[in-house]
Amino acid sequence: HLFFAGDTGYSRDLADIRARYAARQTAAAGGGFDIALLPIGAYAPRWFMAGQHVDVEEAVKIHRDLGAKRSLGVHWGTFQLSDEALDEPPKTLAAVRLAEGIGEDEVFVLAIGETRRVRARGFVG
């Protein structure tokens, strides 16, 4: 099961999505979201962007609110849309993961051209 956030500001409503979705997805059916595609870029300045674009810390909150098994950071590094540097979001994500004890395989980004093989339930490698 895949969750795609699109452009979004942070809201605790995402925890409600988890509750409603998980109620229909039993453990026997694989339960919850296997992967969430979460935006991690185009967030600065916060006073202007907070309503439309989460920052990295909020993306990690969404990952946890959804109970996603893994999350891929998207919506960064393509073109200069906001005030943060193009390469800032993955660097910030690495720092947030370290601070919160989150593994690199749980919340991650892919480099341009990088691929990962995906099975029906989880990653191959």
Predicted regions: what is each one?
Residues 9-110:
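Cap/insert and terminal regions of metallo-dependent hydrolase folds
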Residues 120-125:
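Short, surface-exposed amphipathic charged segments that create phosphate/polyanion-binding patches used
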Residues 1-6:
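Conserved beta-strand hairpin/beta-sheet module of binuclear metal-dependent hydrolase folds
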Residues 112-118:
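A short acidic, often aromatic-flanked loop/helix-cap motif at beta-alpha or helix-coil junctions
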Residues 26, 118-119:
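Small/flexible residues
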